[in-house]
Amino acid sequence: MTNATPTPVIVTGAAGKMGREVIKAVVQADDLRLYAAVDRNPDVFSLDAGELVGLDTLNIELTNELEPVLAAAAQEKQPCVMVDFTHPSSVYSNIRSAIAYGVFPVIGTTGLSDEQMNDLTEFTEKASMGCLVIPNFSIGMVLLQQAAVQASQYFDHVEIIELHHNQKADAPSGTAVKTAQLLGDLGKTYNPALVEEKEHLAGARGSLGSENIRIHSIRLPGLIAHQEVLFGAPGQLYTLRHDTSDRACYMPGVLLSIRKVTQLQTLSYGLEKIL
């Protein structure tokens, strides 16, 4: 369905791999329009956003200043959405700034702390504005997480392995943390100790979350984004795995989030909340 007035979209982290995919997806969507592209990389300043992603000229130059973009977007008649794929060090302030200007954030950047998430939830509720924080925009990953929740009814032992490219700044991944949280929300105690473990190298057994589920993080060139959830029981191993071969797989989830976030009045975490 094509809206009479397309929703304006700001892309932050526009020169990154995900940012470029978002620009292409937004430009190709009839009900959306690229409003601005923001990135701190000095090599792309003043470059046209279309040229950046291999499309025709869009007459939208990349800028490194988010605040003036948000201020201008606040004057638009149509609600504006900001899609953020930046860095854990800047995403929190980006969200607060967007909400302050009445721009709806869709966040793909991971690394927000629990304290920051609680603060942002309170901030969005006071503003009665929607904000989506999505650790993984892949429909396939949501299905994996749902399958893991079902499997947890029958297995008491589970560990998670997440594998990403070596330019990912945070570990463990937000997707792995989210998966562990979904399993922990069931109120089950996982991985009862059978022996007293001793690590000869710190961290050899991975990170241990409050759900008592260990998460192992791997960072290598050649990887994009992959996750395994391994359930073990006497005589059997049940493995769930999701592999990303192209970042285009995230775009249906990104576009859905852009279209849904303006209908919300508080922060929501996870793609499954809007499916």
From Swiss-Prot:
Domain of life: Bacteria
Keyword check for Membrane: no
Annotated compartments: Cytoplasm
Positions that bind NAD(+): 13-18, 108-110
Enzyme Commission number(s): 1.17.1.8
Family: Belongs to the DapB family.
Protein name: 4-hydroxy-tetrahydrodipicolinate reductase
Taxonomic classification: Bacteria, Bacillati, Cyanobacteriota, Cyanophyceae, Acaryochloridales
